Amino acid sequence: MAGMSQRPPSMYWCVGPEESAVCPERAMETLNGAGDTGGKPSTRGGDPAARSRRTEGIRAAYRRGDRGGARDLLEEACDQCASQLEKGQLLSIPAAYGDLEMVRYLLSKRLVELPTEPTDDNPAVVAAYFGHTAVVQELLESLPGPCSPQRLLNWMLALACQRGHLGVVKLLVLTHGADPESYAVRKNEFPVIVRLPLYAAIKSGNEDIAIFLLRHGAYFCSYILLDSPDPSKHLLRKYFIEASPLPSSYPGKTALRVKWSHLRLPWVDLDWLIDISCQITELDLSANCLATLPSVIPWGLINLRKLNLSDNHLGELPGVQSSDEIICSRLLEIDISSNKLSHLPPGFLHLSKLQKLTASKNCLEKLFEEENATNWIGLRKLQELDISDNKLTELPALFLHSFKSLNSLNVSRNNLKVFPDPWACPLKCCKASRNALECLPDKMAVFWKNHLKDVDFSENALKEVPLGLFQLDALMFLRLQGNQLAALPPQEKWTCRQLKTLDLSRNQLGKNEDGLKTKRIAFFTTRGRQRSGTEAASVLEFPAFLSESLEVLCLNDNHLDTVPPSVCLLKSLSELYLGNNPGLRELPPELGQLGNLWQLDTEDLTISNVPAEIQKEGPKAMLSYLRAQLRKAEKCKLMKMIIVGPPRQGKSTLLEILQTGRAPQVVHGEATIRTTKWELQRPAGSRAKVESVEFNVWDIGGPASMATVNQCFFTDKALYVVVWNLALGEEAVANLQFWLLNIEAKAPNAVVLVVGTHLDLIEAKFRVERIATLRAYVLALCRSPSGSRATGFPDITFKHLHEISCKSLEGQEGLRQLIFHVTCSMKDVGSTIGCQRLAGRLIPRSYLSLQEAVLAEQQRRSRDDDVQYLTDRQLEQLVEQTPDNDIKDYEDLQSAISFLIETGTLLHFPDTSHGLRNLYFLDPIWLSECLQRIFNIKGSRSVAKNGVIRAEDLRMLLVGTGFTQQTEEQYFQFLAKFEIALPVANDSYLLPHLLPSKPGLDTHGMRHPTANTIQRVFKMSFVPVGFWQRFIARMLISLAEMDLQLFENKKNTKSRNRKVTIYSFTGNQRNRCSTFRVKRNQTIYWQEGLLVTFDGGYLSVESSDVNWKKKKSGGMKIVCQSEVRDFSAMAFITDHVNSLIDQWFPALTATESDGTPLMEQYVPCPVCETAWAQHTDPSEKSEDVQYFDMEDCVLTAIERDFISCPRHPDLPVPLQELVPELFMTDFPARLFLENSKLEHSEDEGSVLGQGGSGTVIYRARYQGQPVAVKRFHIKKFKNFANVPADTMLRHLRATDAMKNFSEFRQEASMLHALQHPCIVALIGISIHPLCFALELAPLSSLNTVLSENARDSSFIPLGHMLTQKIAYQIASGLAYLHKKNIIFCDLKSDNILVWSLDVKEHINIKLSDYGISRQSFHEGALGVEGTPGYQAPEIRPRIVYDEKVDMFSYGMVLYELLSGQRPALGHHQLQIAKKLSKGIRPVLGQPEEVQFRRLQALMMECWDTKPEKRPLALSVVSQMKDPTFATFMYELCCGKQTAFFSSQGQEYTVVFWDGKEESRNYTVVNTEKGLMEVQRMCCPGMKVSCQLQVQRSLWTATEDQKIYIYTLKGMCPLNTPQQALDTPAVVTCFLAVPVIKKNSYLVLAGLADGLVAVFPVVRGTPKDSCSYLCSHTANRSKFSIADEDARQNPYPVKAMEVVNSGSEVWYSNGPGLLVIDCASLEICRRLEPYMAPSMVTSVVCSSEGRGEEVVWCLDDKANSLVMYHSTTYQLCARYFCGVPSPLRDMFPVRPLDTEPPAASHTANPKVPEGDSIADVSIMYSEELGTQILIHQESLTDYCSMSSYSSSPPRQAARSPSSLPSSPASSSSVPFSTDCEDSDMLHTPGAASDRSEHDLTPMDGETFSQHLQAVKILAVRDLIWVPRRGGDVIVIGLEKDSGAQRGRVIAVLKARELTPHGVLVDAAVVAKDTVVCTFENENTEWCLAVWRGWGAREFDIFYQSYEELGRLEACTRKRR
């Protein structure tokens, strides 16, 4: 402060209000009087008084507003100033008055320099003081470059903050880097708090500046909080708290998120938040300087969800005296990391909902203080715990074991010596690196087997690891580096099949026992290495299953001396680290097998068996070398040469000359193809490394008609020799075009030599010149004018041209040299051994052996006259039989096949997704002969009429070829692939070769040019091979469909007099859909053209050889004539042309290297054209007719509807007629939107999402209804109007516009054609603006909905019912599309829009976005790629695929529905595609975790790599109509057990007991989690007969007539029983009956001798007294049943049930039921549902529709279900359960008597109460099987159950009344007219049922046993009856016209359970889950878990697809 005392603070720092409004005058006075400036008086400028007068004059001028005068005075003053100091003082005057111009003048012209000391009169300081931002900017920019005057900047900043100049503050901080946290100080001064920018801003009340500073690096300090408490609080409350509405339980309140982080707050004042404490949901106080907190944080914040206290100085949190003070029970996340806590606050243990706790980087020595933690519940919901970077030495099990939901634990960087014992929780991630762990617990696999994925125990002191670590089934990442491991557990016991990364680096692997390195170590052996002595070899081996999953393996820094052999089998490895193993000197050749390995670390290794130069090239080269060694690769010099060219050009002669060196004597016949071998020796003087090259020569000839067939012999990596006749000159050059285009189309990038023959026919004297000319012509064909390669043609340069004379043999030697030289330079791209030259390439020995085997097979078949093709299975067998075969995987087999194709050994066409790809042709000659049959057909009417042949006639041509019915599909695919026969309908094919080259009659006579004609010309640089054939086939399909539409409309429409009606044609790949439809008069088509005439016009398409711009070209011309000027036919044709090019010939959409498009469209002006038609001289046409470029039309169409022609500007041409496809004139008028009724804005708030290709989807309203508008934006370029006509920019914009119009048209057409409830409907279209309106999805996309719902649950985030419905609706939409031959191609959750999440709604989703959908046109689809991860593996460039690609994507969408996650397999498209093709799929979880067994199985079926194995959408739809699909959750195998018991109440656990005495054990299964929580826990004792859990007690009865009572506490095992009771007989069943008194109940134990023991229990403890009820005594004394009556036999009590609201207990007594009155504990009534020898086995009480109780019972002999009304004891219904197909059975329910009968004390055995089941007869005969005859009023009176005769009687017995009264009545089952079909539909796969019963040889008795009901379960308001065969009958009670009836509403049967034996028991757990247990002959048990659906759920399920069916039908009718 010393510096301050010498001079008073400047006026700037007077922060009080009275001095703050300082004017420039006062400021200037102060500036002048502020003391000596330190400058000497100027010698020239006069005295200081004069200077003062000058400055005063300047100021006065500024004050008057006379800036001009002030500037003159300033300039004058400058002239008189000598020093910079004086000039600086002058500069401060205009700076003070904000005169920017004068400031610039002084700085630039007068070179005034700005001083950098922050004095009061510094111009920058003055400008900052007065807030002149522009002046400040100018002044600071005048400073020299490197200068950074920080003191000046800080002074100006503090000043501007105090004065309130936000603009200056922003400029200083953001542009010039002033530090908001620095004090403003001058030289030799100390900082003062008032000069801190934030302090100054707050003190002077400049709130906006204070906030700006706080957001840009300023912080609160204690002075600010003390001196300005209220402003500070105001700032914190106003700017650092965000609001959002609170949940509905707090109406009107807003939730507050307090974000006070990174403010360096020294404390938090209670006053800041006490009044809002109940609204705070998020409190972030991280990165402050807090050492204490107010007591309200966090314990008193009742709504707090998230708390972040990280990065402070907290030693503890506020204490609490009792748990009552902790009211923040809703807390979900706490972050308290980077503090100074020594233990976690005990209050945390009361936060029962806490999910995430981060406490890393503290000083924790204990987790919690045990002595302070009292009556805590524990963090049962905690999912993530991070306590890394602390000082913990142990983790107490006491606390950890309460973390029941923990899935992530991080205890890295502590001092743990022991890892805690595992406990029951779903732990997924465990990190414990950098501790002092010496051992690990061995029970990890018990609790975490199916959960733990990521484990890190690196950098510890582990000497061994337990086997359990490698038995974690879900384990993906295991890091054990930096330990002391010398061995791993034996690999044969590992089960970690999903392990991806294993890091074992920096261990002791390979060291022997003494710890010394030895030459031969005990740790590893390699194959073939023998060991001496008896030493047991301990080998590091990895299990075989890791080859599918392990990707990264680190073995570096160990003591290995060999690479473990099993490492070489890990074929998925991508990274392998072997460095720093000093003993490792060799790499095994087997490493070469690892095809995916890209990182091989051999750092510091001396590898002796790989040459050094190869090691330098890196891992790829090393692996290639090892692979070649391993596979005994040999150099191969065999290649394929294909000689082609027009007929009779001298091909065969040329070949003979090359082979023999002389001209042939015999002329060869016209064979289509000849094959021969030729070896070419190295010419003298060649430097090539190979001695010779061997060719498999295919000489392809034959008549010109066979030219299309010959393309099928063109393959990659072959040398093509195109032969032509020089003597024919230019004509022959033109003919070369066909061959060159063909070669490039079928074998892109092939090497082609063009050889001219007949050289001797050119005169010698003109020869050189003539040859040069002809060569130029050939090159002009293949190269563009700029010299670059022409698109569509092979890469031919002058080096590839040669001439030869076959007579004089001139040029033959040169040709040999050329062939040898070219061959030696050909590369083998994509080889398994690495890129190498083709000649002399290394080929695995096994490939060569396979080649020999294939050739031998081909010769054998030739001898036997057998078919010359192999199926894929036959080829695989051939591979397997080849000696020393090492071809193991699919990719290697493909490489071998490629080699066979490249060498001419095989022909194979892998570019279809299935079918043709499964055939391998051995002999091209044979194949050619087969195809020749087709070409031998003449266009006779008998077989092929108009070039179209019926499929059966085409099949007839197969007879005798060897193609069978099984391979006919492949044959047809082959014909279509090479355009030999193209499908034009389901049963007919077009044979293009039969079409005439010109129309058969004069078409010009039919065409009269009139004013009603428009034309379109397509100019193409080349016409691709197959273009016309495919175009005509598509046209024929479309025209046929058009006729069909007309025919249907005639039938359907009553009166429609329009000539052009709506025609929905979804054409081609791009699914364009023109509405053009006419009635054809004549259709004429030929090889390159088609003409259709109709009333009032015609349309024609033909090839045109137009020669515009004197450039080679072909193309097509379209003419459309219409008297009514409806030119929609033009749109119809152009749609087809564009789509065909898009899908099959995309090369045409490219440009030449000089930028000219390969294809251009022109539109001749119709006005000029009509005028020209009047002329007679055709030569004038080109000059007189204007050709509009399509680009001009498109660009004009964006702005207006007319285009002007330069030849008649006064007569504009309407674009709607010229380019009808752009204006959608072929669409019905009703589809065009009225723009006046469309309300939409394109601001950001209205954007719903981005479509493909830059389209944007907006929220809008049309006619008052919300809609989604998809807008196609055409790019705008700056100054586009000024762009010259012919520029690249114009072309780019036109291309973009064309693309937009094209995609708009395609998608709108597609949507218009589709009408289905699960597909988004088109509302209308608009051209200006270019958009269409769709239905608006209220809830956005499925992806968004899933991501919002997936946070809370691990699987099925939308719940099972909604998930089922959504999956069903997607499948239904797909089935509809596939029925329409449309392949969606881009199905994913983003393209599925959600309408409703209410399961009761009929429609929940709709499919959208058909941007890349394709129509398959009977030929499959080609091209388009969907979204990586969803896209099927077979979609690759140039591969033809079918609708099964959508089923693959559907599988991925199912994955999303089940997991809530996207199917992520990587970030790069190539990486994802590779993984998918290898069969790698996203990991979901075990079925018992996911709990939607059928949907998961369907998902896996859909994403099968082979398309033919995927289901059809239609079959998926029918599968999902079975309720089993939705209700079956999972099965769980439980091993050998002896008894099963379930829990009562809300618990999800079931218990198995096994063994007896010392080996007795129990297993606890949690059915909710699908998890065995306790596995075979030992609990010695006698065999358990019965068990009951009541509250916290478990009662178990054993076979030694004892009851043991155990107390249940947490996870504690059952050790010693709390109490033991004796009983007179073995207990067979228990029942707990609550009593009115609190905490007391009765336990009834039914005994084997018929007694019932009653134990009163108070507070969990049974009283000493126990009473017995004797059934025998009651029967005799009360019900007068004699002792000799069969009903008095000692029957065990099998079932007991509490009835009549707990006032009675009904229990079984043989065939009868006895009723106990709970009040008096006496038997008061007997009921007789059955007759002896039947025994009641199950009793259950449920409520019926009116809410009254009914009791159901079941017996073991008659197998019938009896229903009693509980209050009247009246028998109401009986149903026989032994019906094989009970679905939709009904039985009457007797109405109640008005008065209940008096209590019956007698029981007559002859006439039991109610309807007796006395008349049941069971008969068995050979013919009829088992028959059960029941004489009662049931609709299931007669059932024959023989293996095959069950159905007919069943159907006969069914009367119409057995069907539901209405299709959608409550809990009804939909039905079809055909009962049998309908049964098939609802019985879980009727076919599978049939197979289970009918196809197994089963005697009648076994069959009837399978139909025996096992138990009755009351599930919600339904009765479920499981039967021994494994199916479950579901029965509901329903009203029907006043009366009640029972009906079987479903039969559930899971075929998956068949192998598990018979159903033995069942139970309902937690009221909503049904568990059935199955036992097989080995006493192995399996649990089947079902969703316990009630009537409501079944109702929703059935209605969902009934309603969808109804809506589909309505849509069809509407159309």
UniProtKB/Swiss-Prot annotation:
ANK repeats lie at residues 51-81, 86-116, 119-148, 152-182, 193-222. One of its GO terms (molecular function) is identical protein binding. Activated by phosphorylation by PKC. Binds both GTP and GDP; binding of GTP stimulates kinase activity. Sterically autoinhibited in its dimeric state. Changing residue 1144 to A: Abolishes phosphorylation of RAB7A. Its cofactor is Mg(2+); Mn(2+). Residues 632-826 form the Roc domain. It is a peripheral membrane protein. Residues 1791-1907 are annotated as: WD40 loop. LRR repeats lie at residues 279-300, 303-324, 330-351, 353-374, 381-402, 405-426, 427-447, 451-472, 474-495, 498-519, 549-570, 572-594, 596-617. Autophosphorylated. Autophosphorylation is inhibited in its dimeric state. Phosphorylated by protein kinase C isozymes PRKCA, PRKCB, PRKCG, PRKCE, PRKCZ and PRKCT at Thr-1061, Ser-1064, Ser-1074 and Thr-1075. Phosphorylation at these Ser-1064, Ser-1074 and Thr-1075 activates the kinase activity of LRRK1 to phosphorylate RAB7A. Changing residue 1270 to W: Loss of autophosphorylation. GO terms for cellular component: cytosol; mitochondrion; plasma membrane. GDP binds at residues 647-648, 650-653, 669-670, 758, 760, 806-807. PANTHER family: LRR RECEPTOR-LIKE SERINE/THREONINE-PROTEIN KINASE-RELATED (PTHR48056), RECEPTOR PROTEIN-TYROSINE KINASE CEPR1 (PTHR48056:SF81). This is Leucine-rich repeat serine/threonine-protein kinase 1.
